């Protein structure tokens, strides 16, 4: 068989039938979703990635440049093995990516297709991506370039590319989709590129369809290799020796050897009893050269025959827990295959104790069984597979009976994919020679221990435990712990400044130290014990000294609260909890000495601080001279707190969920929560509070609490929840409130809201200090006067309330001053509830009528395009604030200069949390919906705001051309840009972004001119129709049609008189391009002869029939009713009837129309659409046949109602249906059966009474026993 010639012939046939060149391909471009064509540029320093997708047969792949890709959610992550860095992502699919693969390198081809990869998804599309790893120089000693080092190209592609659309293929930092097709009708399960044909891609789906994709011409061919039930394709494997063969694995256990060039089945193997999960097609040349399988005594008598060199060997594995080796039986593939050996991985599956949660594997549970295979030509003697637990096994193909060698244990759960990394030099010959020598040595020393096994390749595995492990010499060298859920919360602590605690949606807390271990920056510790739900909020106990910094309080999605002890790796869960998820959880700071109020100079401040320190401890004396440096000042404050609280233990926790604040006692885990809402109202009876609380935060000293609400208000309380003041600036829900960490800015508060704003407030205390001091001195030790002071205070409060009765509702609006106007004072209510404070402060609290608050808005930061989910103050610079938003970006603001100084882009989805690093003042981390945590350097970002330098557009990916069926109008509409996952907040304000149908409704009430303009816009936006004529299409745009002009002019200007003189007649002109002589030609469409037009229509209709475009085939033949009857016959013959064709068949006459309806109803019955089949039968008056359809399909209810609506009540068919329905339900529903018999009791021919009595005596249920006697009496 000449394989190459067959491919060439097939390709020529395709081109002959479709006359499509590259120019035509560009005319059929479909706009891809916006996220596919965006060239994003990410500059993250490190990335904690999302884990791979589970239970997919081709979830990962690696190329010769050691670029590793794997599918995660709807994206593909790219990892450079040489530099040990994640270098980008491919974003564009709208559903889970199920399969990925690389194009193969062809040394003889001068192209860059080996830099392309292919992906298949549950969104029914196959996409081809171009990316660049900056390894074109193949220098292994150099790191990745700066542009690609920090994830350039992630998010679909790179923002640095696309400056020149014509040169985008040469952009080294761009990842984007260049081709795609939508030919699959079900989710794609497997994609694979041919190792022998550079532009050939095959893909299979859940419906059993195989799609051949030729990227050079951008053509696709959908093929169903087999027809039947349970024919979902699970895996594909190209032949390494035959360019026209592919092995197809199905969920029903069948392996099919298929010739996709001639579209025929070569051989069918009943390989397994369950899903085929992996197929390895061994390279026959390498197998023969290295004597693989030779020493197992499996060869036939004709082994010496030269044809044996072409024998095919396969390996398959399945959910039936078997790995089988197959060998071709005869000299031809059509002879079939025989199973020469079966490996049993369950025999070597040892249960592992899980260190990452989730328990072990039940080997008897087929839903949990997964096997995968890997074979490399560079180590041909060994076949790699996983066990049924978590091991990687090495099977010796020379000695089948030897036990497999195991990789050192590192995974804890099922392994989904094993990938062997090819040599970077791509030199197969050299590697093969080395392997051959090793193989011969192995044959001589078969009895030696298997520990001498040496693989020439590195190996990468992905597992259910969310780990990606890179192996060398059977040992785990690099471990990458992926995230399996949304990242909801991140926190860090000064006692472990290089570690971030991450609350994740996969029921775990991760401890990640990206700056601690440069060799393994992706290793993280997983805390999972006792966590049984998503961790939506967490807080490290950072204010109670080093001994308590190992405590992490966390709130979960199910409303429960717990504390995790890192040292003991155990968690404790409080009883009870919120009804819904917890938004925020915090530790109550320890009580700290409160400094004297209203201090005007630094000398007084130092004196008072010294006095306070003398009362508690003397460790603060050395800290008052270091106030110039912000970083030192922050560390001093932390040290002061730590030194003064060494003996204190954490006490209280506060959580917000279900719009309530709960207090938890850390010292009593058996105690349930305390609902603070009624307590707050009891402490502040004269205030009205919103019912829906969303966030809570303590200030630096712990003496003030801020609480946010869903209506946009913020309430400020004392540490004992005594109301101080209220802020009303936001118009929507408050997501986060955060006090500044620095002493000099301790009264500055930031808030984030769903109104897309970040607002900075400053609270200032004002009042007459000298008078207050005098009052304190005069009232010391005078208890009676204190009581009088209380009475006077209450009187003053009443007077103030009467005077300001009309101002209380809008007090914040009156005091907020954005334009340096006169500040308004707020009086603090005086309620003494704190019995632990000293006498001096108690007196002050009772006599602080002159202490008032001034609240001013420092700035409103407006720039985010969606909800602001989180804010975080810098730990080094008191003026820097980071914010995370649902627009997918992280923003850094400067409250001093009131500017946006950096915008970090790269997340694919909403960003839920942001946290600053304590080690590097320029670093901060963020996490969100894309299940990743990214470490950013805000000082190196190219953008300052969200709107700056809008993301550049890459060239639109080309949509493939279907050569097997028509692209219907509905499919063309589906090819229009899809809505991205993230909503665009500017659409409501930008009419150009509103869909055309919305513009119609908006402008329908406008004048006629506006309406006409809108209709024009809608018409222009409709999908372009493909011409019905295939051979004669685009006649207007032909560039080489000038040769037809002169003959056409002579044709139309020649009359009978002229023909006598010139001896030219119109008959001498040939029509079309198939002239047999050298006469001048004109196109057939300009002919005046009907027979030529009829030939043209006939020729075009045959072309439509060849590609199964039956809709246009019938439409074309309906132009001439004489041809319609024969056209309908052809459609019926091919079984391609549709509803549209049936409706058009009326033109052929009533008799033919009725026959077509009857045939179409039978077709509908075969596919299970009984109701529509009945409708077509009723259309032609066949009521009895319609009832019979329901009767045969046991749809008695429909049949009876249809019969009663069309026939008389005493029609015999009705009683017959009731009787059959009664017999059908005698066992399952005897009561209903009795009712059906009673409905036919008067029909003597049916013996219903006898059948009913027999039923009553045979079926004895409680219900029948109750009515049996009554029924028997009535019937007698």
From Swiss-Prot:
Instruction: Alphabetically list the UniProt keywords.
Output: Coiled coil, Cytoplasm, Nucleus, Repeat, RNA-binding, WD repeat
Question: What ranges does the record give for the region Disordered, renumbered to this chain?
Answer: 138-157, 586-652, 772-809, 967-997
In chain numbering, the residues marked as site (Interaction with U4 snRNA) are: 368, 413, 466, 486, 528, 579, 732
Q: Which Pfam families match?
A: Beta-prop_RIG_1st, TPR_GEMI5, WD40
**GO biological process, any:** spliceosomal snRNP assembly
Q: Where is the composition biased (Polar residues)?
A: 979-992
Q: What is this protein called?
A: Component of gems protein 5
**Which comment does the entry carry about domains?**
The WD repeat domain mediates binding to U1 snRNA and to U4 snRNA. The WD repeat domain also mediates binding to the 7-methylguanosine cap that is found both on mRNA and snRNA molecules. The regions that bind snRNA molecules and the isolated 7-methylguanosine cap overlap at least partially. Besides, the WD repeat domain mediates interaction with the 60S large ribosomal subunit.
Among SUPFAM superfamilies, the record links this protein to: WD40 repeat-like
Q: Give the Basic and acidic residues compositional bias ranges.
A: 772-793
Role according to the record:
The SMN complex catalyzes the assembly of small nuclear ribonucleoproteins (snRNPs), the building blocks of the spliceosome, and thereby plays an important role in the splicing of cellular pre-mRNAs. Most spliceosomal snRNPs contain a common set of Sm proteins SNRPB, SNRPD1, SNRPD2, SNRPD3, SNRPE, SNRPF and SNRPG that assemble in a heptameric protein ring on the Sm site of the small nuclear RNA to form the core snRNP (Sm core).
User: Tell me, what is one Gene Ontology molecular-function annotation carried by this entry?
Assistant: mRNA 3'-UTR binding
Q: How does it assemble?
A: Part of the core SMN complex.
Q: Where in the cell is it found?
A: Nucleus, Nucleoplasm; Nucleus, Gem; Cytoplasm
Does the entry annotate any disulfide bonds, and if so which pairs? none
The record's comment on protein family reads: Belongs to the WD repeat gemin-5 family.
Give the SMART domains listed for this entry.
WD40
- Positions annotated as WD repeat: 92-139, 183-223, 228-268, 271-336, 364-405, 438-481, 485-522, 530-574, 688-727, 729-771, 863-903, 906-946
Q: Where is the composition biased (Low complexity)?
A: 598-646
What the entry lists under InterPro entries is as follows: Beta-prop_GEMI5_1st (IPR056432), Gemin-5 (IPR052640), TPR_GEMI5 (IPR056421), WD40/YVTN_repeat-like_dom_sf (IPR015943), WD40_repeat_CS (IPR019775), WD40_repeat_dom_sf (IPR036322), WD40_rpt (IPR001680)
The protein's site described by Interaction with U4 snRNA and with the 7-methylguanosine cap of RNA molecules is found at 583, 910
Q: Where is the composition biased (Acidic residues)?
A: 794-809
Q: Name one GO cellular component term.
A: nucleus
| Lineage top rank: taxon | Eukaryota
Keyword Repeat on entry: yes
């Amino acid at each position: 068989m000449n394989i190459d010639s067959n491919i060439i012939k097939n390709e020529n046939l395709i081109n002959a039938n479709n006359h499509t060149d590259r120019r035509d391909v560009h005319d059929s471009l479909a706009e891809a979703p916006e996220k596919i064509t965006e060239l994003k540029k990410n500059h993250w320093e490190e990335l904690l990635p999302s884990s791979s997708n589970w239970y997919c047969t081709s979830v990962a792949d690696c190329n010769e440049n050691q670029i590793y890709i794997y599918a995660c959610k709807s994206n593909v992550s790219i990892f450079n093995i040489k530099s040990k860095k994640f270098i980008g992502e491919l974003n564009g699919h709208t559903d889970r990516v199920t399969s990925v693969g690389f194009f193969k390198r062809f040394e003889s081809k001068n192209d860059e297709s080996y830099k392309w990869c292919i992906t298949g998804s549950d969104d029914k599309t196959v996409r081809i991506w171009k990316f660049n790893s900056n390894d074109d120089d193949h220098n292994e000693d150099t790191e990745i370039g700066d542009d690609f080092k920090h994830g350039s190209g992630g998010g679909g592609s790179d923002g640095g590319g696309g400056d020149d659309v014509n040169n985008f293929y040469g952009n080294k930092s761009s990842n984007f989709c260049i081709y795609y097709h939508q030919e699959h009708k079900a989710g794609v399960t497997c994609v694979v590129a041919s190792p022998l044909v550079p532009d050939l891609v095959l893909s299979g789906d859940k419906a059993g369809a195989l799609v051949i994709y030729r990227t050079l011409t951008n053509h696709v061919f959908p093929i169903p290799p087999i027809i039947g039930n349970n024919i979902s394709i699970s895996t594909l494997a190209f032949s390494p020796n035959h360019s026209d063969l592919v092995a197809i694995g199905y969920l029903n256990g069948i392996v099919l050897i298929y010739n996709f060039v001639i579209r025929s089945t070569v051989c069918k193997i009943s390989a397994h009893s369950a899903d085929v999960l992996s197929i390895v097609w061994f390279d026959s040349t390498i197998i023969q050269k290295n004597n693989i399988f030779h020493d197992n005594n499996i060869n036939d008598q004709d082994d010496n025959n030269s044809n044996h060199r072409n024998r095919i060997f396969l390996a398959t594995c399945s959910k039936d827990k078997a790995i089988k080796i197959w060998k071709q039986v005869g000299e031809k593939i059509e002879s079939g295959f025989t199973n020469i050996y079966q490996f049993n991985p369950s025999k070597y599956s040892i249960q592992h104790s899980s260190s990452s949660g989730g328990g072990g594997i039940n080997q008897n549970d087929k839903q949990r069984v997964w096997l995968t295979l890997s074979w490399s030509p560079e180590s041909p003697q060994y076949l790699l597979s996983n066990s049924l637990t978590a091991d990687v096994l090495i099977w010796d193909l020379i000695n089948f009976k030897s036990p497999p060698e195991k990789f050192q244990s590192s995974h804890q759960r099922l392994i989904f994919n094993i990938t062997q990394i090819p040599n970077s030099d791509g030199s197969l010959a050299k590697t093969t020679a080395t392997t051959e020598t090793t193989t011969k040595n192995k044959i001589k020393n078969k009895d030696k221990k298997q520990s001498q096994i040496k693989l020439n390749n590195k190996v990468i595995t992905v597992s259910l435990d969310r780990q990606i492990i890179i192996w060398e010499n059977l040992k785990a060298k690099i471990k990458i712990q992926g995230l399996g859920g949304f990242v909801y919360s991140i926190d860090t602590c000064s006692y472990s400044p290089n570690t971030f605690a991450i609350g994740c949606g996969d029921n775990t807390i991760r401890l990640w130290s990206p700056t601690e271990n440069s060799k393994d920056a992706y290793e993280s510790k997983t805390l999972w014990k006792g966590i049984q739900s998503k961790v939506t909020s967490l807080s490290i106990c950072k204010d109670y000294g080093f001994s308590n910094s190992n405590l992490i309080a966390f709130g979960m999605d199910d409303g429960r609260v717990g504390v995790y002890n890192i040292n003991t790796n155990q968690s404790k869960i409080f009883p009870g909890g919120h009804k819904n998820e917890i938004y925020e959880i915090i530790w109550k700071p320890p009580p700290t000495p409160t400094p004297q109020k209203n201090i005007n100079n630094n000398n007084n401040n130092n004196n008072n601080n010294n006095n306070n320190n003398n009362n508690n401890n003397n460790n603060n004396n050395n800290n008052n001279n270091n106030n110039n440096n912000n970083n030192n000042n922050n560390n001093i404050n932390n040290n002061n707190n730590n030194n003064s609280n060494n003996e204190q233990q954490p006490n209280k926790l506060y959580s917000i969920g279900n719009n309530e604040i709960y207090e938890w006692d850390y010292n009593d885990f058996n105690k349930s929560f305390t609902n603070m809402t009624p307590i707050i109202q009891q402490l502040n009876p004269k205030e009205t509070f919103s019912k829906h609380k969303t966030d809570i935060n303590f200030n630096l000293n712990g003496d003030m609490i801020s609480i946010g609400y869903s209506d946009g208000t913020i309430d400020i309380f004392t540490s004992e929840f005594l109301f101080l003041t209220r802020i009303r600036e936001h118009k929507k829900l408050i997501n986060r409130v955060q006090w500044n960490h620095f002493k000099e800015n301790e009264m500055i508060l930031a808030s984030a809201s769903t109104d897309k704003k970040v607002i900075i407030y400053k609270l200032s205390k004002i009042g007459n200090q000298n008078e207050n001091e005098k009052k304190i001195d005069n009232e010391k030790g005078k208890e009676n006067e204190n009581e009088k002071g209380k009475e006077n205070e209450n009187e003053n409060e009443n007077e103030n309330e009467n005077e300001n009765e009309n101002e209380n509702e809008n007090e914040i609006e009156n005091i907020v001053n954005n334009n340096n106007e006169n500040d308004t004072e707020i009086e603090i209510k005086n309620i003494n509830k704190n019995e632990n404070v000293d006498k001096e402060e108690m007196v002050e609290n009772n006599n602080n009528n002159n202490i008032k608050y001034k609240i001013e808005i420092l700035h409103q930061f407006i720039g985010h395009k969606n909800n602001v989910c989180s804010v975080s103050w810098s730990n080094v610079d008191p003026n820097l604030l980071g914010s995370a938003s649902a627009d997918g970006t992280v923003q850094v603001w400067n409250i001093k200069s009131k500017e946006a100084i950096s915008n970090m882009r790269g997340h694919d989805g909403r960003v839920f949390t942001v946290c600053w690093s304590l080690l590097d003042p320029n670093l901060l981390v963020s996490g969100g919906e894309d299940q990743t945590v990214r470490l950013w350097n805000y000082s190196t970002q190219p953008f300052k705001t969200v709107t700056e330098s809008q993301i550049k557009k890459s060239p639109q990916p080309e949509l493939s051309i279907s050569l097997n069926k028509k692209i219907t109008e509905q499919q063309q509409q589906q090819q229009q840009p899809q809505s991205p996952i993230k909503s665009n907040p500017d659409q409501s304000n930008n009419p150009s972004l509103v869909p055309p149908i919305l513009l119609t409704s908006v402008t329908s009430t406008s004048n006629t001119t506006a309406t006409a303009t809108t209709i024009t816009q809608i018409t222009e936006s409709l999908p372009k129709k493909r011409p019905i004529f295939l051979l004669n299409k685009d006649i207007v745009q032909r560039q080489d049609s000038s040769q037809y002009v002169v003959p056409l002019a002579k044709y139309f200007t020649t009359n009978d008189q002229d023909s006598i003189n010139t001896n030219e007649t119109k008959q001498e002109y040939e029509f079309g391009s198939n002239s047999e002589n050298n006469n001048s030609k004109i196109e057939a469409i300009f002919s005046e002869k009907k027979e030529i037009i009829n030939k043209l229509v006939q020729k075009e209709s045959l072309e439509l029939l060849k590609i199964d475009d039956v809709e246009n085939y019938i439409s074309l033949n309906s132009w001439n009713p004489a041809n319609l009857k024969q056209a309908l016959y052809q459609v019926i013959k091919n079984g391609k009837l549709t509803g549209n064709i049936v409706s058009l068949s009326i033109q052929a006459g009533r008799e033919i129309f009725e026959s077509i309806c009857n045939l179409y109803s039978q077709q509908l019955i075969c596919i299970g659409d009984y109701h529509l089949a009945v409708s077509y039968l009723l259309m032609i008056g066949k009521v009895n046949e319609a009832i019979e359809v329901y009767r045969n399909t046991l749809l008695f209810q429909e049949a009876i109602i249809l019969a009663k609506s069309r026939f008389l009540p005493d029609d015999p068919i009705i009683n017959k249906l009731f009787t059959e329905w009664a017999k059908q339900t005698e066992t399952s529903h005897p009561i209903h059966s009795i009712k059906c018999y009673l409905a036919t009791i008067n029909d003597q021919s049916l013996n219903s009474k006898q059948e009913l009595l027999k039923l009553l005596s045979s079926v004895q249920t409680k219900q029948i026993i109750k009515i049996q006697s009554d029924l028997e009496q009535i019937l007698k």
